[in-house]
Structures are given as C-alpha cells and as structure tokens.
C-alpha cells in the first residue's frame, strides 16, 4: 500500500502512515485484518488508531454488524485524501522561495513563490514535486533523515545546484549597519557571519519574510543586504554598493526534486545569467 501524501484535517496534519490505518480498516472492516495488511501487530494498529483519534479529537471508527467501520469523520478524511491524490496525479507543482523563484519562472513556467515556512507546509502536505531553496542551510536540514521523518516522513529526493548569487548593500542614503532589515529564510546569515568575523558591528532592526517587502522598507530609511539577482526590482534612486567582502557572500541556489528530473538547456542558462545569477 503506497501512500505518500500528508493531509490537514481540523488544523492537524495526518501523516501517510496514519492514512494507511484508515484505508486498511475501511478495506477490511477488521482491525486484525487491517493489521495483517499493514504487516504490524493488532495491538500496535489499535494504539496508533487511538493516538490518531486523540490527536484529531474525533471518533474515527465504531463496531457494527458489518464489522468495524469508519465514522463520518473517518470517511471525510479518506475523501479528502482521495481528492488530493487525484489532483496530484494530474499536476506538477513547483514551489520556490523568492530568489529561487526567479529561476523557477524560467524553468517551470508558473511556480508557487512563497516564504520557505509556507513552502515547508506545502511539502508536508505532499504538494511539492520540485522545491526551490534560497538558503543552502535548508539543503542540509532536508538532508538530515531525522528532520525528514519528523517533518514530512521518509522520501527520496535529488538536489540540483542551479546557480550562484551574491549580496550587495542597498540603501536610500548612507548605508547604516545598525539599521538593517533582515529577510527570514534567506542566506543573509552568511553576511552576518562575515560581519562578525570582520569586526563590523551591526543590528537587524526589523525582519520580514519577503525580500520585496524589505525593498519597500529601504524607502523608510532601513539599509538592506539584498540578493544581487533582485537588483532590477529596486528604485533607481537607491544607493547600491558592492562590499569589500562581496566575493565571500557567494551562495548556491538549489532545487530539490522529488522524483522529477531537472534539465536546463542553453537558452535557459542564458536567461538565468541575464537575471544576474552566476552559473
């Protein structure tokens, strides 16, 4: 029984293994037979099912003359799973961070571009075939089997390093290291580590998830370390400075593929370079 989709029910995530419990019980109408189908002990099956009920706060099954059957809530969960499963078979979903999203628009046409915490939520729900990652730190985390099991369950994936980017200094007036706007889930951590090593004092006054919101805040007087590939989005009267440690800010833009191949032709490479990325 292959189930690799996580769904949400009443604000709680139901994992693939938990969905298997309901599918097996619905199919066999017997906890003992369902346990055999899943190759686990009946006691283990019952414990897992009880835990799922406690987690969701609803009754999922009851005894009847026809055997052990699912309640309306249990059937609703399976209907939701089947609906999502059918949609996924007919669609290809690319989800990217804001920087990798610039590349994803070239490679995949119509990606979902969002903050990485939202991307992880979609990944947990099984809605991601290709994931664009702005910060290589998350490549490390996703490569940790313990993180995968706790967040999305076990799965196989391939990592594709597509391009490199650097950071530049953007400000309305004079760049102020002590009045920075930070971007969550970006590779700005690389810059902060460099500043610490260089002995440059700095302070992040406000943090946002969206680099385009960060660019707007530059108009309010904040200074920003921005991905060079996003320079085309800034106002013409902004100051742009390439720091002395510019070369040290280089970082990879990766894509994670869950069972899909990623191939790039020469035309796409040319377009990616035109955006300001390095390949």
Swiss-Prot record:
Coiled-coil residues are none
Gene3D superfamilies in UniProt: Winged helix-like DNA-binding domain superfamily/Winged helix DNA-binding domain
Gene Ontology molecular function terms on file:
DNA-binding transcription factor activity; transcription cis-regulatory region binding
Q: Which InterPro entries match?
A: Tscrpt_reg_HTH_LysR, WH-like_DNA-bd_sf, WH_DNA-bd_sf
HTH lysR-type domain location is 14-71
Chain residues forming the annotated DNA-binding region:
31-50
Which processes are annotated in GO (biological process)?
A: regulation of DNA-templated transcription
Reply yes or no: does the keyword Cytoplasm apply: no
What keywords sit in the KW lines?
A: DNA-binding, Transcription, Transcription regulation
Q: Name one Pfam family in it.
A: HTH_1
Family under the similarity heading: Belongs to the LysR transcriptional regulatory family.
Q: What is this protein called?
A: Uncharacterized HTH-type transcriptional regulator MJ1120
Organism listed in the record: Methanocaldococcus jannaschii (strain ATCC 43067 / DSM 2661 / JAL-1 / JCM 10045 / NBRC 100440)
């Amino acid at each position: 029984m292959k189930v690799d989709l996580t769904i949400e029910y009443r604000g709680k995530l139901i994992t693939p293994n938990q969905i298997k419990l309901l599918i097996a019980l619905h199919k066999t109408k017997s906890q003992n037979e369902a346990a055999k189908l899943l190759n686990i002990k009946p006691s283990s099956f019952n414990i897992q099912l009880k835990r799922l009920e406690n987690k969701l706060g609803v009754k999922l099954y009851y005894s009847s003359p026809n055997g052990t059957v699912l309640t309306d809530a249990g059937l609703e969960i399976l209907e939701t799973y089947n609906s999502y499963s059918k949609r996924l078979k007919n669609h290809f979903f690319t989800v990217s961070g804001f920087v990798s999203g610039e590349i994803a628009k070239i490679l995949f046409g119509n990606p979902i571009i969002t903050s990485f915490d939202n991307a992880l939520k979609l990944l947990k729900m099984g809605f991601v075939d290709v994931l664009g990652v702005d910060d290589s730190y998350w490549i490390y985390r996703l490569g940790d089997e313990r993180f995968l099991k706790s967040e999305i369950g076990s799965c196989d994936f391939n990592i594709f390093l597509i391009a490199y980017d650097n950071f530049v200094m953007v400000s309305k007036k004079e760049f102020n290291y002590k009045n920075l706007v930070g971007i969550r889930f970006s590779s700005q951590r690389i810059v902060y580590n460099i500043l610490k090593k260089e002995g440059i004092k700095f302070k992040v006054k406000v943090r946002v998830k969206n680099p385009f919101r960060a660019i707007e805040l530059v108009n309010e007087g904040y200074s920003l370390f921005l991905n060079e590939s996003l320079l085309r989005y800034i106002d013409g009267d902004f100051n742009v400075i390439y720091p002395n440690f510019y070369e040290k800010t280089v970082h990879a833009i990766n894509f994670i593929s869950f069972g899909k191949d990623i191939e790039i032709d020469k035309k796409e490479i040319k377009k990616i370079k035109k955006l300001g990325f390095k390949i």
